[in-house]
UniProtKB/Swiss-Prot annotation:
Segments traversing the membrane: 16-36, 58-78, 100-120, 141-161, 165-185, 221-241, 253-273, 292-312, 343-363, 373-393, 399-419, 424-444
Protein name, per record: Probable potassium transport system protein Kup
Catalytically driven reaction(s): K(+)(in) + H(+)(in) = K(+)(out) + H(+)(out)
Family from the record: Belongs to the HAK/KUP transporter (TC 2.A.72) family.
Highest classification ranks of the organism: Bacteria, Bacillati, Bacillota, Bacilli, Lactobacillales
Record-linked PANTHER family: K+ POTASSIUM TRANSPORTER, OSMOTIC STRESS POTASSIUM TRANSPORTER
Molecular function via GO: potassium ion transmembrane transporter activity; symporter activity
Location in or out of the cell: Cell membrane
Main function: Transport of potassium into the cell. Likely operates as a K(+):H(+) symporter.
A GO CC term assigned to this protein in UniProt: plasma membrane
Provenance organism: Streptococcus pyogenes serotype M5 (strain Manfredo)
Disulfide bonds: none
Bilayer topology: Multi-pass membrane protein
HAMAP family for this protein: Kup
Tree of life domain: Bacteria
Length: 666
């Protein structure tokens, strides 16, 4: 990593500051919409809260933001960048060589992040639209929750519908809008606290600890389930590291934290001033002057949409990384934007839309959604803590110190998990079931890959080089193609899948001028694009290792085109002049890609469990993108050949010949 790149990544700028507000802080920045409402409603309403309860609640929020968001994520996790990229899968690629079992927390963390994220657009948009109940001219319409639901669904339909076109055209306004949003949070919160400056006593952690064990707290330790809502967006700070750079997060986080803390303090001051009024509105909107409410609702809705957009984009990135790490099925990925970071996965987009819409229809109100929200993200944070522990050790921190620091955070997060576990029976089971389904798919995909590696036999290419040369020169066979390309998942030195050599020599001898054996390896670095070539001492057999970062598209034909030109220019590969062509001077022949799919035969070597894994994986493949799409072969000549997973499992079955009886013997 060059010093210039490091400096650019770590330094801040005015533009970077604004961009960070629009990308990184959407989730945590919209938490004031519903966190205080959840605390008050779980206490029994505004008229049931006391000054000590409010002080304790604000103190818990402040210290939760400080311990988890500021110390763990901003000060520790942001250091764990994988070539400027963050997120749980980037962190996993940094430490995966330290222990094979680390794939487990990576899969669990990724699954829970995706599942809990499906709830975020529902909670934030519904909370914003419910603010219309406080608008004098619209309150009679939106007191009917059905109208809130309809409006929310319309916004979600538009939001998910525009994903296919890319969001670069509206992304430019995200930063300025969120700057206005955070400024409003800070200013309105500050003015609301002027009548109750004693609210700032909440900075003292004594009030937080006192509330946890106070009889005034009707929920005891389980109040932390609502407190945790204030910091659910902390994981996004780390996940979006690569989009904005570490320096911009360092500079923008103090501003964001100050604004949201002032907003919580302002809502708390309003509650203290109105606890005997009997008003049962969301404290966030109720604390705003009535003549400004409609504008605040519009601003809150925009902030909720931006938060949802950031989450949707983050989900696409998370899934694409999982696919390239071979722990998730392959789905079609498109790039509607001008850069690789703006990707779109249609299947994931509409699954998210379906889950989010069903969440709105099932829970109906933001209060009911809040009861289920946050449970899965506590698990994500715990999994990140486990991986961070290994990262610190890898970076030279003494194991005892690393274990001590991460055990502290794990203990804090486990307490939040325990406090949030009560949400399971109040709707939390929805995100848990979704997370388990995602983990199941990841496990099947990962285990299936390991089984294939276990049973597929490999042969040495050098042992068959002479046969392939004879086939190449044998005019008795028609020319199958000028260039035949085999994509292999497993190619260690000269060892290659037996099924590939079987396809060339046995199944139907494939005569070609050049045989290509291509293996794509996903690197720990996000944006690697390198290759290594071995001509094997010939001009007709080419071993190609493509080294692509886990965020790079695996469009093999485009890379291969460059490699062919390089080899011909260096004289390692003879030019393939074309007698008939509409392109004058064309010196590259035609290509055919052969894809080999291993399917489970009636293999006796497979255990029942392994058979279940492989059959389930085969079923999942029916709804996933084909390898042809994944490797960018839609416009190439492709042959798909199916072979049994275990070629050697062809046993002679006993059978007797019936000898016809002659008439004379009858």
């Amino acid at each position: 990593m060059s010093d210039s790149h490091l400096t650019a990544f770590d330094k801040a700028s005015k533009a970077g500051f604004i961009i960070a507000l629009g990308i990184v802080y959407g989730d945590i920045g919209t938490s004031p919409l519903y966190t205080m409402q959840s605390l008050v409603e779980n206490q029994g309403g505004v008229n049931q809260v006391s000054e000590s309860f409010i002080l304790g609640s604000i103190s818990l929020i402040i210290w939760t933001l400080t311990l988890i968001t500021t110390i763990k994520y901003v000060l520790i996790a942001l250091k764990a960048d994988n070539h400027h990229e963050g997120g749980i899968f980037s962190l996993f690629t940094l430490v995966r060589k330290m222990s094979p079992w680390l794939i487990i927390p990576a899969m669990i963390g990724g699954a829970t992040l995706l599942s809990d994220g499906a709830l975020t657009p529902a909670v934030t948009v519904t909370s914003a639209i419910e603010g219309l109940k406080a608008v004098p001219g619209l309150s009679h319409i939106y007191q009917n929750q059905t109208n809130v639901i309809i409006t929310t669904l319309v916004i979600l339909i538009v939001l998910f519908g525009i994903q296919r076109f890319g969001t670069g055209f509206i992304g430019k306004i995200f930063g300025p809008v969120m700057f206005i949003w955070f400024s409003f949070l800070g200013v309105s919160g500050f003015f609301n606290t002027l009548g109750h400056l004693e609210i700032f006593k909440a900075i003292n952690p004594y009030y937080a600890l006192h509330l946890l064990f106070s009889p005034e707290n009707h929920r005891g330790i389980f109040i932390l389930g609502s407190i945790f809502l204030a910091t659910t967006g902390a994981e996004a700070l780390y996940s979006d590291l690569g989009h904005v750079g570490r320096g911009n997060i360092y500079v923008s986080w103090p501003f964001v934290k100050m604004c949201i803390v002032l907003s919580y303090c302002g809502q708390a001051a309003w509650i203290l001033a109105n606890k005997h009024s009997g008003i049962e509105l969301n404290p966030f909107f109720a604390s705003v002057p009535s003549q400004l409410t409609v504008y605040v609702v519009i601003l809150a809705t925009l902030a909720a949409i931006i938060a949802s957009q950031a989450l949707i984009s983050g989900s696409f990135t998370l899934v694409s990384e999982a696919m390239r790490l071979k722990i998730f099925p392959l789905f079609r990925v498109t790039y509607p934007g001008a850069n690789l970071g703006q990707l779109y996965i249609p299947v994931i987009n509409w699954i998210l839309f379906a889950v989010t819409s069903c969440t709105v229809l099932y829970f109906r109100t933001s209060a009911h959604m809040e009861a289920a929200y946050g449970l899965a993200i506590t698990i994500t944070m715990l999994m990140t803590t486990i991986l961070l522990n290994y990262y610190l050790i890898k970076e030279g921190v003494k194991p005892f110190l690393a274990h001590l620091v991460m055990t502290f955070f794990a203990l804090v997060e486990f307490i939040f998990f325990w406090a949030s576990a009560v949400k399971f029976m109040h709707g939390g089971y929805v995100v848990v079931i979704l997370a388990l389904a995602i983990v199941f798919v990841m496990f099947i995909w990962h285990a299936g890959t390991r089984i294939v590696f276990k049973y597929v036999k490999s042969l040495n290419l050098n042992d068959y080089k002479e046969q392939i040369k004879q086939l190449r020169d044998d005019v008795c066979f028609d020319l199958y193609q000028t260039n035949v390309v085999y994509l292999s998942n497993r190619m260690q030195d000269y060892m290659i899948d037996r099924s590939i050599l079987y396809s060339i020599l046995d199944k139907r001898p494939k005569r070609a001028r050049v045989y290509w054996f291509v293996n794509v390896q996903v690197t720990d670095e996000p944006y690697t694009a390198k290759y290594k070539v071995d001509m094997m001492g010939t001009d007709y057999m080419v071993r190609v290792n493509l080294y692509l970062g886990f965020r790079m598209p695996q469009t093999v034909p485009r890379y291969l085109r460059t490699i062919v030109q390089d080899l011909m220019e260096s004289g390692r590969l003879p030019k393939q002049e074309q007698e008939y062509t509409i392109t004058p001077g064309r010196d590259v022949g035609d290509f055919r890609f052969v894809l080999i799919e291993e399917r489970v035969s009636n293999a006796r070597q497979l255990s029942n469990f392994e058979r279940f894994i492989m059959q389930t994986k085969a079923s999942i493949k029916h709804v996933t993108a084909s390898p042809m799409r994944w490797f960018g072969l839609q416009y190439s000549e492709v042959t798909l050949e199916v072979v049994p997973l275990i070629l050697s499992d062809v046993l002679k079955l006993p059978i007797k010949e019936l000898v016809p009886v002659e008439d004379s013997e009858a």
